[in-house]
Each structure stands twice: as structure tokens, then as C-alpha cells.
Amino acid sequence: NITAIAVTAFLVVFQPELRKALEQLGSQNLLSGILAQDDGKSSQEFNDRTVNELVRATFEMAKVKTGALMVIERGTSLKEIERTGIEISGLVTSQLLINIFEHNTPLHDGAVVIRGNRVAAATCYLPLSDNMSINKALGTRHRAAVGVSETTDSLTIVVSEETGRVSVAEGGMLRSVPTAEALRNILSG
């Protein structure tokens, strides 16, 4: 009986840490080598054209202070996040991204998930970071970008609606991206 109480107390006290550990374990493709399945990525790779379209859209939106949140899938699947939004499955173009994030459109709230050269989904919910060191002046969009980068290997582009500044979240860190060329280098690297 005392063992059951101790286990329950342990689970309650360490719930956030256990959840994070399980998320990270679950996000690693442990079976991918064994179950090698074709996910269609080979014909839809993230390429230079996609990079150019993303850079163009990002800095066009920054110029007019249109808030945006674009999550680029890498090794870790973002299917769970994608399920929280609306399927798009459209080729990445600057026009599509700008239209999605246009303020008075139905799709502007939330994030888009980009897989290869496609916008997989829009209006997606992202996990918010618990990191208390994130600047308080930054809003929910930035906290969400850091949050998804803490639990996946994704790269997230953020455009601030307040300032028009562009940032990138990767590996739990948020960094400012001052120029289109700097963003192009990050996306190509």
C-alpha cells in the first residue's frame, strides 16, 4: 500500500518532467530504420525554391507587420501538431503564406506546418514553452515557437505583429534574423 502511494506521489510531483521525457522519446523515430516506409518526402524535398519563397513571404509580412508562425518539419514528425489545424497540402509559395497570415482571413491564427515543399496545415496549435528566461516583451507567438523547438527538431520562423521583426526558434533557443540573406543562410544550412 505504501508503494502505491509513493509511486502516485512520484508521478504527481514529476509529471511535467515525465511528460517532456515521454514526448522526446515518442518523437524519436526509433522504428524508422526497421519499418522503412515511403512517406512521399523524396519527391517533395525542401529545396532552394522553397527557401526563396519562405524568405520572400517572411520579409514581405515583416515589412507590413503581419504576424506569422511557420514551423518547418525536419526529422521529427509534426503529424500530431498538424492534426490540430486544417489540412492545406499546397505548394509553398510566398503568395499562399501571405494570404494565410493576412489578418482578417479564417486561417491567420495559429501556425502553419511545412513539410518538404508543401504547406501541410494551417491554424495549428503549438505547445507553449515553460522557459521563464524568454523575454516578457515577446508574446504567445514567440513562446509557441520556442515551445515546439524544445520538443522537436523543427525550425520555426516567427514574424512579430508588433515590431515586424523576424526570429527563428531552434533547439529551444530564439534568435533574431535581421536580413533576408541571414534567413536564407539559416534555411539552407
Question: What are these model-predicted stretches?
Answer:
Residues A9, F14-G189:
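Divalent-cation
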